[in-house]
Amino acid sequence: MVQRPRGTRDFLPDEMEARRMIEGRMREAVRRWGYREVATPIFEDLSLFTMRSGQGIIDEMYVFQDKGGRDLALRPELTAAVLRMYVNEARVLAKPLRWCYFADCFRYERPQKGRYRQFWQFGVELIGADTAAADAEVILVADNAIRSSGLDYDLKIGHLGLMKHLLADVGEEVRRKVMAYLDKKEFDGLKDYLETAGLAALTDPLTRLLAAETLDEAFAVTGPLPEEGRIREMAALLDATGVRYSYNFGIARGLDYYTGMVFEGFAKNLGAESQIVGGGAYRLAQVFGGDDAPSVGFAIGFDRVMVALGEVQTRKQKIVGVVSTAEGRPFAFRVANAFRTAGIRADLDLSDRGLGAQLARAAKEADFAVLIGEREVATGTVTLKNLATGTQTAVTIDLAVRTVIDGSR
């Protein structure tokens, strides 16, 4: 028996209904901010990803050659593809551009809870805006999208300018190692490394910055910075909305990717793989041959959101089970079509079993049953049975439809 590939999943109808419902809530949340959906190919030229991340990323991707010998890769994320599309197709459009996306991505990594080889991202890119308002908007869009799902989470906001200031006088290799320790939250290891590297003087300011809970505490460590005004303005805009967040000036992800504001969000019940969103301000368009378009964006790990939510109660729609004799089947198709035209789900029994057996099957899922026998065919009516109360009445097709609709309210 052929099995599905490792790191992938099958979704049965109940799961898909839950996923579509949460996806729909997120789509509606970002739509209210003016974000419009875009889509890119599932596979891209390999260089799209290696030109920014280096050749080392190849081991983490699904890479192949097509019949023309071109090196291609299944997309491991969406931002690079969306910026490639901007450079190819949309540089002349009026900015800022508010784009959103929902799509599957692929990474060759060890599968575990909340981490898969095929996974879905929901995200936005705000292209062509370089202000505190742009930073605040994208954070709020992410917060709205996540909270629309019903998930409570912890939002952490930082700014790479403060950490870069403290590390301005160290070499690139040292900076990378410091950020790697911070990213892994190996603070004891960081202290030992700084002492070994002759940089013990950095231990105190780094420790104080990591412990800072307010902007005043953070700038007391760094002193005045050119970015301070923008950071404080962003904070004022966020505070005006009442959004719940805290500061983390030790966010070290994407040092070579993000240019200023960064943020992350963590579910409270996922353990080690608890991060559900990451984003920030960046400038990538030039890397792909475009103009220097400042951008802000985020990506939500949709699968982790679903894991964190647990069992999702979907909105149950009314179901009508249509049962009939073999002779009454043409009329049954007509009746079922009338319900569907009115927006009601109608399930036809396709077996040749008797009416009793068909009715018993319908009662397992349907709210109403429509019985069609010789009498109903002759009179052009139906027998409508409420499966919750057991009452049944001979009515016209139109009245049956109206009765079910009224019972759905």
Swiss-Prot record:
Keyword Transmembrane helix: no
Coarse class of the protein's main subcellular location: cytoplasm
Subcellular localization: Cytoplasm
Keywords tagged on the record: Aminoacyl-tRNA synthetase, ATP-binding, Cytoplasm, Ligase, Nucleotide-binding, Protein biosynthesis
Domain of life: Archaea
GO function terms (MF aspect): ATP binding; histidine-tRNA ligase activity
Family designation: Belongs to the class-II aminoacyl-tRNA synthetase family.
Name of the protein: Histidine--tRNA ligase
Protein source organism: Methanosphaerula palustris (strain ATCC BAA-1556 / DSM 19958 / E1-9c)
